[in-house]
Amino acid sequence: MKYLTLLCALLLSSCYEVERNCNEFKTGTFESKITIDGVQYNSIFSRTSKLQVEEFNGVKDSTYVRWINDCEMIFKTIHPKNLAEQKDIHLKILTTTQNSYKFEYGYVGDTNKQLGSATRID
């Protein structure tokens, strides 16, 4: 009986697929929320298929956007001001809802990832 219950649980859980309708979020205006070391940071950004302009703490920053696939992209800062801004950022959309998505991001080649969410505001 234990094995039957375990088998049923495995079969049911393997059928669940996370919704990822990433194409709905390739362009638009969004509010992003990330938490780093227990502090939440909010920003507003607008994205076209090739460019993203973000405002954080009153400072605007522009990046080129290169889509790797439907749910992953690389950001390259247009006018980097320091070495950290010269590093490209990889972002992967993990899950989507009707008007928001959860994502992970980090420097290209770095195993350290941060999590965040973005909500469409346009």
PLM regions and their residue ranges:
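Positively charged n-region of N-terminal signal peptides that target proteins for export
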Residues: 1-4
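C-terminal motif of bacterial Sec signal peptides marking the signal peptidase cleavage site
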Residues: 11-14
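Bacterial signal peptide processing site
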Residues: 16-18
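Tryptophan-anchored aromatic micro-motifs
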Residues: 22-38
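N-terminal glycine/threonine-rich, aromatic-flanked beta-hairpin/loop signature
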Residues: 40-68
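Short, exposed beta-strand-loop hairpins at the edges of beta-sheets
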Residues: 54, 102-115
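A short, structured loop/turn motif at beta-sheet edges
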Residues: 64-72, 93-100, 120-122
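An anionic, turn-rich surface loop/hairpin at beta-sheet edges
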Residues: 75-98
